[in-house]
């Protein structure tokens, strides 16, 4: 998996940062895909600067209904329809996202020509496509807001083909059964247990993508042990009280969460427009002082998971 940041500003766009939108590129060898997390104003325009277009999207996850996370959605849906893309799309989000989509399309005389499914969610597991699971966590914000934890299923370990050949097992259908951990019976009556010839399973990658939030109990569960945590750092540590009053987090709080949750890496985003490049570097330094494995996202930054 890899993350492509389309927008990294908080509240309003700036000359260098658009509002929130993140692509998750699912780099599976046989079932690749592209998911979008939040869709602030101008998201479809930002996508023009990437290798992806709205027609490739399979799923969109909306954290909450504030405009800087949502107002790009109607235009993206309409453009996807105008392009004649027939592939289905599922939108996940809090209560009200269905009404928002229906109202904006109706009042603008617009429609979608592709199958559009809208899932209004609550906290808990919301998706398992056989390759990965998505769990939603309710966060602390003035509007109903969620963060999403995406965890790949573990991959089976490699089959020790050399040892199997030495045991008299020839490549073919039996190898497939053994790779699945099954027990097979050979022509001479011997039974071979696939588990005895498999390397340990490879743990799937994991990422936690937060919506806007002040510190809360659910945040630790959402982030616990993930490879990558994407979290807002709207304001610096000196403005922590103001950040929390508006349902946001400071640099210090975000980095502390990353440390307590034992994540692999922290990626900072959702930066207030008050900070220029020098100010952004100060935000980064505040986070790294607590959690060194921190990166600052810019528009079009790409990070592997």
UniProtKB/Swiss-Prot annotation:
The keyword Cytoplasm does not apply. One of its GO terms (molecular function) is zinc ion binding. Its cofactor is Zn(2+). Zn(2+) 2 binds at residues 68-69, 212, 270. Binds 2 Zn(2+) ions. It is an enzyme of class 3 (hydrolase). Zn(2+) 1 binds at residues 64, 66, 141, 212. Homodimer. HAMAP family: RNase_Z_BN. Zinc phosphodiesterase, which has both exoribonuclease and endoribonuclease activities. This is Ribonuclease BN.
